[in-house]
Amino acid sequence: MTMGVVLPSKVVSLVIRRPPHFTFKPGDYIFVNIPAIATFEWHPFTISSAPEQSDVISLHIRVVGHWTNKLYEYFESEQVNTN
């Protein structure tokens, strides 16, 4: 399960199912790949959810370049198509 929501200021809130036994501490990051945007590109993002949240991992990603702009456009079109 991956869910993305566009927020003001060109930010995407990305929520990913947390794998079993995945541990992290504040300040840790994960590499993200969205094949619909770029099949072989992985990008690092800081985890914004609390380690105590056991079911999902949250990321807040601001548009700063080509890939993050494509991410924003992808989830923006997903929101338009579901509304």
Task: Describe each PLM feature range.
Residues 1-83:
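FNR-like FAD-binding dehydrogenase module
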